[in-house]
């Protein structure tokens, strides 16, 4: 009886394992990533980047359209977001290298509860970051760019076309690759 029970358990485990392997193989072959663009390349389908209003540290309104004719890197972040904090040194490095050629908009997603302007300002000061920081106090900028999770980054060329958008942490290599592509035109 024990041997039969053991054999049935082993057989069931083997069938489940085989089903998992075959399912994985099937799904892997049919997987098509959405909007994936290799580092340093741009999508062939450019979309005009939507305009929005954010606020600088003094509370002055800043329109995205104020930067028309210049390439722009937008990064949506918050102090409570571990991946945002982790990628910030790469953005600081990129700003130091390309800040004269590209507009950097580091947009703090400021909901007033989980993230406040004061939290963000203190964080930026403590870390010594020099890139420009803006505050999305009504979450409208994050909304029009589909920043449903943080961090989120968008690359806009000088023609105002959104050439790449990414949800999630960006490697330094990818960040610099997309910046180089923005500067090619």
Can you say where each PLM-predicted feature lies in the sequence?
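Thiol-/selenol-based redox modules, centered on thioredoxin-like
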Residues: 155-185
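Conserved helix-turn-beta segment immediately C-terminal to the redox Cys motif
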Residues: 70, 88-108, 125, 172, ...
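A short beta-strand-turn-helix
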Residues: 51-72, 96
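Conserved redox-active cysteine motifs that mediate thiol-disulfide chemistry
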Residues: 76-93
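Short, internal strand/loop/helix patches
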Residues: 121-159
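N-terminal targeting signals for export/organelle localization
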Residues: 1-49, 185
């Amino acid at each position: 009886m024990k041997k039969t029970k053991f054999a049935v358990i082993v057989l069931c485990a083997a069938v489940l394992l085989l089903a998992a392997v075959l399912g994985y193989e099937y799904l892997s072959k049919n997987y098509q990533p959405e909007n994936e663009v290799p580092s340093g390349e741009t999508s062939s389908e450019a979309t005009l980047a939507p305009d929005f209003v954010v606020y600088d540290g003094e509370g002055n309104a800043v329109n995205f359209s104020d930067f028309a004719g210049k390439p722009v890197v937008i990064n949506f972040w918050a102090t409570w977001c571990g991946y945002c904090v982790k990628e910030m040194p790469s953005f600081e490095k990129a700003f130091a290298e390309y800040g004269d050629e590209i507009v950097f908009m580091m947009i703090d997603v400021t909901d007033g509860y989980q993230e406040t302007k004061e939290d963000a300002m203190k964080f930026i000061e403590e870390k010594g970051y020099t890139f420009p920081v803006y505050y999305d106090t009504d979450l409208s900028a994050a909304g029009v760019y589909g920043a449903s999770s943080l961090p989120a980054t968008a690359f806009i060329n000088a023609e105002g076309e959104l050439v790449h958008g990414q949800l999630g942490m960006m490697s330094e290599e990818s960040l610099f690759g997309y910046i180089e592509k923005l500067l090619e035109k």
